[in-house]
């Protein structure tokens, strides 16, 4: 059992039949009362983020999550297909579970697949990925007063705002958490 007082980001646990990973945890003590713990946690089955409240002495069941390194092969209308490069086994994951992640996946991208007792929960991407710009409108001359941005399209068809100097065929670094421009790749 895990004491909720020991919550910190990255800890996985089971509660009410769901599997969560702690994103943030705050501890507060009120006068003579017991300490309270509020945890911002992501439900690994649904992808939803919720705030859970516990009293100081509560304990939760740990969830032992297995992570497997896999390569993205391709996707169709309903699934994505991944291959384990160590034994060449393939798995499929429902496209709805990885909708956001698809914005950053290109062929042969390496991902971590999170599994709980042979149930595939989701995939974990690196914090940042390098993607090629496939469409970028020309910079408008004279529009340089207040950090001008323009919308570009990446090789995965994801659109985001970038600085004006980004051109077609440039490779840029994108945050997989926020979907924002991080910098230009070297």
Swiss-Prot record:
Gene Ontology terms for molecular function: translation elongation factor activity
Top-rank taxon, per record: Bacteria
BP-aspect Gene Ontology terms: peptide biosynthetic process
Pfam families: EFP, EFP_N, Elong-fact-P_C
Record InterPro entries: Elong-fact-P_C, NA-bd_OB-fold, Rib_uL2_dom2, Transl_elong_fac_P/YeiP, Transl_elong_KOW-like, Transl_elong_P/YeiP_cen, Transl_elongation_fac_P, Translation_prot_SH3-like_sf
One Gene Ontology cellular component: cytoplasm
Subcellular location(s) per record: Cytoplasm
Pathway(s) this gene product operates in, as recorded in its UniProt entry: Protein biosynthesis; polypeptide chain elongation
SUPFAM superfamilies to which the protein is assigned, alphabetical: Nucleic acid-binding proteins, Translation proteins SH3-like domain
Signal peptide: none
Keywords linked to the UniProt accession: Cytoplasm, Elongation factor, Protein biosynthesis
Family: Belongs to the elongation factor P family.
Entries under PANTHER family matching the protein: ELONGATION FACTOR P (PTHR30053), ELONGATION FACTOR P (EF-P) FAMILY PROTEIN (PTHR30053:SF12)
Biological role stated in the UniProt entry: Involved in peptide bond synthesis. Stimulates efficient translation and peptide-bond synthesis on native or reconstituted 70S ribosomes in vitro. Probably functions indirectly by altering the affinity of the ribosome for aminoacyl-tRNA, thus increasing their reactivity as acceptors for peptidyl transferase.
Protein name: Elongation factor P
Gene from which this protein is expressed: efp
């Amino acid at each position: 059992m895990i004491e909720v007082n020991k919550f910190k980001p990255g800890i996985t646990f089971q509660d009410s039949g769901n599997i969560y990973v702690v994103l943030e945890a705050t501890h507060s003590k009120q006068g003579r009362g017991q300490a309270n713990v509020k945890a911002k946690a992501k439900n690994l089955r649904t992808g939803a983020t919720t705030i859970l409240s516990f009293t100081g002495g509560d304990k939760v069941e740990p969830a032992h999550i297995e992570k497997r390194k896999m390569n993205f092969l391709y996707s169709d209308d309903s699934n994505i297909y991944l291959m384990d490069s160590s034994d060449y086994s393939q798995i499929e994951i429902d496209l709805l579970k990885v909708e956001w992640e698809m914005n950053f996946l290109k062929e042969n991208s390496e991902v971590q697949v999170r599994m709980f007792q042979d149930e595939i929960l989701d995939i974990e991407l690196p914090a940042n990925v390098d993607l090629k710009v496939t469409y970028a409108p020309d910079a408008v001359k004279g529009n340089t007063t207040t950090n001008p941005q323009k919308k570009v399209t990446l090789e995965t068809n994801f659109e985001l705002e970038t600085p004006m100097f980004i051109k077609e065929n440039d490779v840029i670094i994108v945050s997989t958490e926020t979907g924002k421009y991080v910098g230009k790749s070297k």
